[in-house]
Amino acid sequence: MAKKTKAEDPKKRIITLRKEIGRHNDLYYKENAPVITDKEFDILVKELQKLESENPDLADVSSPTAQVGSDLSPQFSKFKHKVPVLSLENTYNETELSEWLEKTGIEENYSLEWKIDGASILLYYEKGKLTNCVTRGSGGIGDVVTENVKTISTIPHTLSEEMNLTVRGEIFMTFADFEEFNEEYGGKFANPRNLAAGSIKQKDPLDVAKRPLRIYVYDVYFSSSRKGINTHKDILSLLKKEKFPLAPDTTILTGKKLLREIESFRKKKDKMPFPVDGLVIKLDSLNLRESLGETSHSPRWARAFKFDALLKESTIEEIDFAIGRTGKVTPRAKVTPISLAGTTVTYATLHNQDYINQLGAGIGAKVLISKRGEIIPAVEKVTFPPKTIFVLPNQCPSCNTKLTKVDDSVDFFCTNRHCPERKLNQLIFFCSKKQMNIEGLGERQIQIFFEKGWVKDIPDLYTLEKYKPTLLELDGFGEKSVKIIFDAIEKSKEKDFRFTLPSIGLNEVGPKVTEILIENGYDSWDKLLTLSKSKTANEDLKAIHGIGPRTIEALLTHLKDKETLKLVATLKKLGLKFQADETEKSDLQPFVGQSWCVTGSFENFQPRDLAMDLITKHGGKKVTSVSSKTTHLLYGPGAGSKLDKATELGVKLVTESEFLDLLKQEGIAID
């Protein structure tokens, strides 16, 4: 989590929190791999909300407090939701909930229902026919996954009347179905929530149909008149009449009775056949809902009551360490196996030495284990102390290098760049889907090649074929799988600077920094090398919006580092591209001499970079920030500070409809 330092400047803390919350949103919604609990996440959000309210001059519509997390994926077509799909504000105790009920109306009726831990989905019906199934996405725009969702047999494809409405539900998997499916596939999936969320994003509906997905629906948005539907109870009756599957135990009761009923739900939680992480409480009256309205992030008429993470006792048997690709050392406890949230837990994270000291943890200690967000096992509390508190060794367990702390970090690092475990994790990172995407080279395969000495560093991947005869003799490496690996390695050479630079794992140089460098003319390794030799390198980089002092220092250090220079030179000789591919140019060049920036969301350009691609293809220049040199700003709903700055500077403002008219006038077709 983003750790607060004493007397930290509010502006710096706000920036830190926004970045940290954005990272955790991506891990949860896009990667299905959260690393903190929901409660820890909400603590960060509440701190940011407080700071933003105390410092209104630092408000920003792009702040995560003004948006919902996004699960948008580039491979799916996009759909603009007819009503914003908001998230719920969370509460973790009865006192907070009681205060909200008093404010909203303690005597009013509320619905109380399970909060299922799955994947949110919206079912769009036009004239009674199911036309689109769409993920929540960013809240304004979602991914169209219609054919995948239609494989769930309990979803009605036709309603009894020609109604136009949107049904919201949650796609999930029961614990029993998950265990059976996961066993069949070698235990490769972490939990039901991840598998359900990943399943609806599969490319082939036939693959989705093999997965035991289920759905419960819980709300309806009406396109026009509600036709006598005045309460949530009426909505549930309509859904039941149309034969939609509804979650068990949903009840309507007054605010006073609701507080008493929560305890009975809490007792049932661990016996539920599907994953739940809390309760949803909503005002029953739709008219009252409309009068209360919503914020940009959540409705004022609903709350999520989140259960604290499930805890179980176990004993620490051993403590070992993971060494990441950056050298960060993470201790983890091997514990007596326990069953927790439907899975067997044998390891739990201990984070760092400071955390171990705070807990008083060590070998032999009895501890409480939680599954963070019911996903990440962690040691939460010591219930019976060990003989001695565990102390990290002074030396790296992989290479015996002395461990050190970097700057003010609470973590220890192995600084040996040739540490075997660091090298192994660098290789895994390089081959991963988000980096060079070398199919067939997962963690297991890379570890085998690494242990055999075939692949010790990134360049060795591109000479691996010399071991092909021996490789084919290994169990699990047939002709077909080996061909996939070598084809993928060769195909990775087609990736340009946008991928090669961030994939080699240079500290502070990720995809975003790489894109900013390219946009500002540093579109190759050679140009960066030339820059590094300039006396004005520091000043030139400082002039680029989006690149801070820490990144500048790291980048210039990398560009003078002998090992980094040797690595890139070797990879270039092996055929990898360290220059950005030129954007395809058209004979039509109406945007020559123009610099365009983009902000907001768009109906016809999803993602919005598609609009910028058209501009660069037809002679224009794309910029990431508004300045006096910017000639045009293309803006849509949700435009923030860029629109204000462009207005102040007199930059020409262009709406989506105006942009479409301009393209039409110039004879430019949208691909």
UniProtKB/Swiss-Prot annotation:
Protein name per the record: DNA ligase
EC code: 6.5.1.2
Class of the enzyme per the UniProt entry, highest EC level: ligase
Functional note: DNA ligase that catalyzes the formation of phosphodiester linkages between 5'-phosphoryl and 3'-hydroxyl groups in double-stranded DNA using NAD as a coenzyme and as the energy source for the reaction. It is essential for DNA replication and repair of damaged DNA.
Binding site for NAD(+): 38-42, 87-88, 113, 136, 170, 282, 306
Repeat listed as a keyword: no
An annotated Gene Ontology molecular function: DNA binding
Organism: Leptospira biflexa serovar Patoc (strain Patoc 1 / ATCC 23582 / Paris)
InterPro entries registered for this protein in UniProt: BRCT_dom (IPR001357), BRCT_dom_sf (IPR036420), DNA_ligase (IPR001679), DNAligase_adenylation (IPR013839), DNAligase_N (IPR013840), Hlx-hairpin-Hlx_DNA-bd_motif (IPR003583), NA-bd_OB-fold (IPR012340), NAD_DNA_ligase_OB (IPR004150)
Cofactor: Mg(2+); Mn(2+)
Classification via CDD domains: BRCT_DNA_ligase_like, LIGANc
Positions of Zn(2+) binding: 396, 399, 414, 419
